[in-house]
């Protein structure tokens, strides 16, 4: 398969619609959307896939309890997901439901292909089964006799099943790990897979079930339904038209450049998924990024603990961009992120209001005060303080690119906020009010130009994360065609000519009353 450059294909996991999506699901999706927007900004042909994983015993049970057929239930949940992603301005290109014919028919073809190749065989499965996780475990994998992933009770089950011969490909997989260091990020996840699953002896994977019927039937043995992971993982291919009459998208976008998954489904994506692709003789994704969870101070989110927060709650009260910013800023690479009402309000007040909004407001006000809103042009001969700011901005932009290209999202945002802080410091260093008083007009012009220019750079940097805020900043500093902004515009320092800031600067973010908002968030988390 010919691999095209200058394209970017990013996927989220397809989400299991067993209930309302909380901020953990929102984080994954916002992250994918941010990376898509960044690569679009760089002029790349970018494509994002998301969707819902709709088969299995758990869905069948939930649908029955709610008095609906499984299909009615999953369609309702998919509609809710699309509504949420619209509210969060997620620019996905395709939303796949695994109950769609374009998926189910191809999964059956893939199963038959594996059978013909001798990758799948029939046997009998006995193991400890976790219904919520839809996963079998050996006795040694259990933790205190319970599911190692979710901590719930497991059942000993025995049934006829088809198995995928994982052992056949395991050496090839480990070799691939070693030869492709960018395949798994962060890198420590590779060692987890090897030490926890591969070295102890990788079990063959059960890929069908007979104890329920809500799933894709095996064509040549219809009492079997194809089990969740062979069904779910292949959505990344079926959505592009793999094994269909039209595989244009597959030729254009596969292999995926970035696949984002939570740590709870890491082994399925880092072991089973690449092995399936090897068996199909398809190229593997360039990078699979495994992120941690968003936790509460008292552990995982749970309705019984009264600590669940939904993205709609944050968006309706504080706006979309602060919600996106908080989710992306609070998730470190190597550990779980923590959500607390106090942390959310603090980020809003300090980062967005004090640092960013005040910088925009002060700068626009000064250009209006000293130059009637007309932005002076670049003089080409920066003084020492100006040059230090220019060099610092260039350095921070390069570091930002390095961090974002390595998917260190929170660290990339830190580089932007370092630049915001340095630009605020530049105002204190240059003291424009003193320059005006002393009638040092050329120095004052250079200072105003550098402030506006840095705001332009900051707006471009935050555009993938907070598009509306970026466009607001650009509009306030006199750049109207925000849709024409491209990443390559970010480095030059002499791009602004004949522009005028708006007459009265508008605060982008207004300071929150800490006690009031903390109490509000605590109250809605208990509902």
Predicted regions and their residues:
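Short functional micro-motifs and their immediate structural scaffolds
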Residues: 138, 155-156
